[in-house]
């Protein structure tokens, strides 16, 4: 199966230019292709995964991937289908983000062998180009009429109170020149990107043909949608980042576990390197079992291992199991740090707090009266163990102090997992 056929079978092709010619070229020879990543934050998020993994799929098929980080274009920001003008970031901020994203992209690709990946930065050429060169050598090849007819531009112009600045209007010229430059430097003949990049990609194809007299191609990947119509890649806490310091491996693992049955088999095709035959077998087995599908677990394991590694996957599984177990002794200090980052609602507490106060503080009870009822009915657990009276000498005017949180409840001297009922948790972080 060719790489194009594999992408088609996974539903990963939204649009292409001359797919027959591209498929024939890929079958005849090994090519160089690229995808651009603008630094709009200090980390990539799961919305970037399809193009990143597509580069990897092409490399596994023997082709040379080029990961282009937009040190120059990131200073402006892509206006495509954005409702309003982007805020401009300082050169120092963008430079820091460029380095972070370069480091994140590196593990996905191999930089050794005959088709070793290439890391590029468009600041290397735009940083040396002056305004007159830009207008003479690039600008003259672009029709303003054609640019105004782009859907992404028309939406901005037609939106009341929005409009588009010349800075953002000129973005497609910069991205278009990236293709021509990478074609000249590295022989790149294919640009891939998200479906919102189609206009920019075709602009680059046309410019490369004009400047270099070369036939090149474009391929876009689909917009990832969920069956319920909500946006993919967002949680109540915001974006799901690939940086473990912004989204913990535990929370990352949980995100994939919660994928709906209606989406999970599509996402296995989109995001994993399991074969179509393996995915079809998983789906058939799930449908025949009549029990909870295994697909979500497989997806969560594959994705967490791919992004964070085997050790992080094991930690995510250990945390997931321990939260609902009586014995939480297997949790490490690093596990608690993940929970404090984004795994559980975290609350700072001080010595002397009792269980009733902790339940109300964390929102696990709406009142002291309700909290006492939970404690009396043995519905409250501390680190997996039932909360019990441990302070017989408490003051008569403070009856709730009969059940105090003490040093013995502090894991690593800092953390206590408070649980009410089967599924309601909070993390107490001791000052």
Swiss-Prot record:
Chain ranges for the short sequence motif 'KMSKS' region as given in the UniProt record = 231-235
Q: Could you tell me the keywords of this UniProt record?
A: Aminoacyl-tRNA synthetase, ATP-binding, Cytoplasm, Ligase, Nucleotide-binding, Protein biosynthesis, RNA-binding
Annotated ATP binding lies at 234
GO CC annotation: cytosol
Q: Does the keyword Ligase apply?
A: yes
The positions making up the signal sequence are none
User: Which pairs of positions does the record mark as disulfide bonds?
Assistant: none
Q: Where does L-tyrosine bind?
A: 34, 171, 175
State whether it acts alone or in a complex, and with which partners, per the record.
Answer: Homodimer.
By sequence similarity, the record places it as follows:
Belongs to the class-I aminoacyl-tRNA synthetase family. TyrS type 1 subfamily.
The entry's protein name is: Tyrosine--tRNA ligase
Upper lineage: Bacteria, Pseudomonadati, Pseudomonadota, Betaproteobacteria, Neisseriales
């Amino acid at each position: 199966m060719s790489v194009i056929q594999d992408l088609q079978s996974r539903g990963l092709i939204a649009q292409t230019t001359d797919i027959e010619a591209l498929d024939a070229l890929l079958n005849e020879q090994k090519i160089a292709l690229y995808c651009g990543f603008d630094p709009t934050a200090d980390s990539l998020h799961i919305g970037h995964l399809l193009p990143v993994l597509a580069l990897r799929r092409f490399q596994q098929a023997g082709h040379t991937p080029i990961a282009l980080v937009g040190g120059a274009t990131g200073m402006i920001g892509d206006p495509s289908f954005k409702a309003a003008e982007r805020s401009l970031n300082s050169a120092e901020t963008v430079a820091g983000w460029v380095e972070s994203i370069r480091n994140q992209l590196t593990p996905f690709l191999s930089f050794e062998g005959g088709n070793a990946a290439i890391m590029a930065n468009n600041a290397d050429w735009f940083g040396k180009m002056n305004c007159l060169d830009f207008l003479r050598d690039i600008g003259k090849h672009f029709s303003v009429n054609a640019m105004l007819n782009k859907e992404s531009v028309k939406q901005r112009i037609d939106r009341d109170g929005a409009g588009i600045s010349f800075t953002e209007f000129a973005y497609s010229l910069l991205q278009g020149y990236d293709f021509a430059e990478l074609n000249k430097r590295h022989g790149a003949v294919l640009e891939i990107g998200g479906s919102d990049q189609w206009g920019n990609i075709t602009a680059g194809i046309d410019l490369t043909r004009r400047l270099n007299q070369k036939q090149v191609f474009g391929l876009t990947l689909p917009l990832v949608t969920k069956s319920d119509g909500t946006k993919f890649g967002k949680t109540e806490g915001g974006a799901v980042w690939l940086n473990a310091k912004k989204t913990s491996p535990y929370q990352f693992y949980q995100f994939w576990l919660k994928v709906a049955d209606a989406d999970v088999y599509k996402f296995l095709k989109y995001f994993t390197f399991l074969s179509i035959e393996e995915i079809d077998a998983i789906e058939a087995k799930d449908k025949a079992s009549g029990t909870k599908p295994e697909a979500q677990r497989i997806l969560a394991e594959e994705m967490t291992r791919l992004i964070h590694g085997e050790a992080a996957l094991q930690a995510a599984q250990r945390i997931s199991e321990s939260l609902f177990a009586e014995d939480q002794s297997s949790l490490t200090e690093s596990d608690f740090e993940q929970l404090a980052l984004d795994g559980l609602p975290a609350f700072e507490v001080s010595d002397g707090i009792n269980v009733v106060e902790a339940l109300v503080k964390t929102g696990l009870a709406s009142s002291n009266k309700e909290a006492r009822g939970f404690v009396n009915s043995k519905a409250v657990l501390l680190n997996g163990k039932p909360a019990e009276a441990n302070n017989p000498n408490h003051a008569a005017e403070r009856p709730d102090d009969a059940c105090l949180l003490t040093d013995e409840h502090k894991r690593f001297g800092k953390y206590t997992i408070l649980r009410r009922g089967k599924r309601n948790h909070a993390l107490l972080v001791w000052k």
